[in-house]
Regions:
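Acyl-CoA/ACP chain-elongation machinery
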Residues: 100
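Lipid interaction determinants
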Residues: 27-95, 105-157
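Sec-dependent bacterial lipoprotein signal peptides
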Residues: 1-27
Length: 157
């Protein structure tokens, strides 16, 4: 009886220690330690990074401003991180550049196109966005904090 009790106690203690160890170590850290990517990083890399996107729909309050972005191709490039990097907007061989940034669960996207001086139409794009839907080829975005009815849909080519 005591041996059976000790085996059961050891099994419970061992399981508890494993659960505690995993709770202190995130999936991202485990992926980094093993040299791999988290599932979110892989999904974002496969479906968003280094891909061409166009604006399918843009609405600023009640105005449809989609036509302002006709002909532009947008690329969020992967640099050294899965969470930030360079971004470009190109139309007729004219390229505007800047940066993009996201948080660790990819719920936020910060767009900052700055060079050379940006056209007024990009002021709408340069903000903190939240993903309302990531269903490639369509990315649906709304302002991160502001509850105004601004909407941006980008489609992967």
């Amino acid at each position: 009886m005591p041996a059976k009790f000790l085996k059961r106690s050891f099994a419970i203690l061992f399981t508890g220690c494993l659960l505690m160890a995993f709770s202190f170590c995130s999936c991202k850290k485990i992926a980094l330690l093993t040299g791999g990517q988290s599932a979110l990083e892989q999904y974002f890399a496969d479906n968003v990074l280094n891909r061409d996107f166009v604006v399918d729909f843009a609405s600023d309050t009640t105005s449809d401003i989609t036509s302002k972005y006709t002909g532009y191709t947008f690329v969020l490039a992967k640099d050294t991180s899965f969470y930030s990097g360079p971004m470009t907007a190109t139309r007729n061989n004219i390229t505007y550049s800047g940066t993009w940034q996201s948080n660790n669960d990819y719920s936020k996207l910060i767009i900052n196109l700055t060079k050379p001086s940006i056209p007024d139409k990009f002021v709408f794009l340069n903000r903190m966005w939240k993903f309302t839907k990531k269903d490639p080829p369509i990315l649906k975005l709304a302002p991160w904090v502001i509850t105004s009815p601004k909407v941006l849909y980008m489609r992967r080519l």
